[in-house]
Curated annotation (Swiss-Prot):
Subcellular location: Secreted
Covalent cross-link (Lanthionine (Ser-Cys)), residues: 4-14
GO CC terms, sorted: extracellular region
Lysinoalanine (Ser-Lys) cross-link site: 6-19
Main location: secreted
Protein name stated in the entry: Lantibiotic duramycin C
Similarity-based family: Belongs to the type B lantibiotic family.
Origin species: Streptomyces griseoluteus
Amino acid sequence: CANSCSYGPLTWSCDGNTK
């Protein structure tokens, strides 16, 4: 994962990638 990570309601995305 990159330094910037965003957490969504159901899924989390890192550096524009969803996992």
